Amino acid sequence: MSVFTKSAFTMSALPSPNTSQPPSAAPSRRGSFANGLASGQLTPVTDPHIVSINVESVLFDMDGTLINSSPAVVKAWELFAEKYPLDLDDILRSAHGMRTIDVLKKWCKITDPELLASEVIRFETAILNSAEDIAKHSGKAGIEVLPGVAKLLADLGEEADKRDGEEKWAICTSSTYFYAGKAIPIAGLPTPKVFVTADSVTRGKPFPDPYLLGASGCNASPFESLVVEDAPTGIRSGKASGALVLATCTSHEREELERERPDFLVDDLSHVKASWDAATNTFNLIIEQPIDRYTPRPTPDVTPVITPAMSRSNSFSGVGQDRPSVRNTQTIMKGSDDLTGNDSVVGSPAASRPGSPGADDSVEKRAEMEFHRRASQSGQAGVTLDAFRRALAGNAAKRRAQSQGEMSQDE
């Protein structure tokens, strides 16, 4: 089991890339997760795909993450297709995770504010009515709770009295409160105190606003929070907020979710266990990922693309600050040699990104680029740029002295 905490780093020379390889994955042992937790048998060698993290708050998407209303949503779109020329396949493939108001603007081409507001209510009423019809005629739940959800929410709700009554978990959905406020009780799930809906924000997912508001409502830092999502649009929103992101393969194929590079990934939420850690005032989460995904990937910084760049806990804007971080900084996917104008290293604003178009090619700038590249590859923080430059200059002087010595010997 891997445990991610802030690690100290002191540079005695130039930092070197971390080239060590993770241990080979152990054979899959289905059903061993709960037993291993109870017996304390999870070890770094036998269970490298299981990780433990501590976070200040847990922020959930709703549809596709906690509940499944897909059959009812399909029927609602079929109803709207009678009035609007819609490509249902395209909508069902692309619209999941977006606010209803944004979806109707895009695909139904509705621009009149009053008509748009009334059609949002009509669409979400159609979902609720369809769910009721499905339950009545099939005997199945029109809105079903996904695996592991009820237990996880119950675990998160325990010991709330030790948190001054704060739940520290929230739902951040793209649905309106009109729909979400009914769907959660219909599914038999608890309604959280912090309930962010489409009505709460002016910009929905993939913008970070829903999760920033959710973290704020939980009195938590987004950088010390975990977003739980099932859709690419939502994953982008969570990553843009600066939070860690856990993807669940409950509505999309794993390959599609992996393209968004979530920090963690599970088949469903039955693979996540939670408990309150009173010593740190955080939730401890144990996440069992697929056996072939034992090294979580760090969240690429896309915030400058969507929202003004924000200081992340793994960025060099926090050098010298002694504050705990749950973010894994041990693996960075790209060095400066691979960067494009749409990438950044350790949270730098777009304009100052090493490798971005228009970057200054001066010696000073190249030293800074090299610093970012090496630090990002080694996954280490706490080194100042001045210290790096001094080390770089020292090594250059040493190489010149060696070169001059070799020339003297040749003469």
Curated annotation (Swiss-Prot):
<feature type="compositionally biased region" description="Polar residues">
    <location>
        <begin position="14"/>
        <end position="23"/>
    </location>
</feature>
<keyword id="KW-0597">Phosphoprotein</keyword>
<feature type="binding site">
    <location>
        <position position="63"/>
    </location>
    <ligand>
        <name>Mg(2+)</name>
    </ligand>
</feature>
<comment type="function">
    <text>Probable phosphatase. Required for cell wall integrity and virulence.</text>
</comment>
<dbReference type="InterPro" id="IPR023198">
    <property type="entry name" value="PGP-like_dom2"/>
</dbReference>
<dbReference type="InterPro" id="IPR023214">
    <property type="entry name" value="HAD_sf"/>
</dbReference>
<dbReference type="GO" id="GO:0046872">
    <property type="term" value="F:metal ion binding"/>
</dbReference>
<dbReference type="InterPro" id="IPR051806">
    <property type="entry name" value="HAD-like_SPP"/>
</dbReference>
<comment type="similarity">
    <text>Belongs to the HAD-like hydrolase superfamily.</text>
</comment>
<feature type="compositionally biased region" description="Basic and acidic residues">
    <location>
        <begin position="362"/>
        <end position="373"/>
    </location>
</feature>
<feature type="binding site">
    <location>
        <position position="338"/>
    </location>
    <ligand>
        <name>Mg(2+)</name>
    </ligand>
</feature>
<dbReference type="Pfam" id="PF00702">
    <property type="entry name" value="Hydrolase"/>
</dbReference>
<keyword id="KW-0479">Metal-binding</keyword>
<feature type="compositionally biased region" description="Polar residues">
    <location>
        <begin position="326"/>
        <end position="345"/>
    </location>
</feature>
<feature type="region of interest" description="Disordered">
    <location>
        <begin position="14"/>
        <end position="33"/>
    </location>
</feature>
<feature type="region of interest" description="Disordered">
    <location>
        <begin position="296"/>
        <end position="386"/>
    </location>
</feature>
<keyword id="KW-0460">Magnesium</keyword>
<dbReference type="InterPro" id="IPR036412">
    <property type="entry name" value="HAD-like_sf"/>
</dbReference>
<keyword id="KW-0378">Hydrolase</keyword>
<feature type="active site" description="Nucleophile">
    <location>
        <position position="61"/>
    </location>
</feature>
<feature type="binding site">
    <location>
        <position position="61"/>
    </location>
    <ligand>
        <name>Mg(2+)</name>
    </ligand>
</feature>
<feature type="active site" description="Proton donor">
    <location>
        <position position="63"/>
    </location>
</feature>
<dbReference type="GO" id="GO:0050308">
    <property type="term" value="F:sugar-phosphatase activity"/>
</dbReference>
<protein>
    <recommendedName>
        <fullName>Probable phosphatase HAD1</fullName>
        <ecNumber>3.1.3.-</ecNumber>
    </recommendedName>
</protein>
<keyword id="KW-0843">Virulence</keyword>
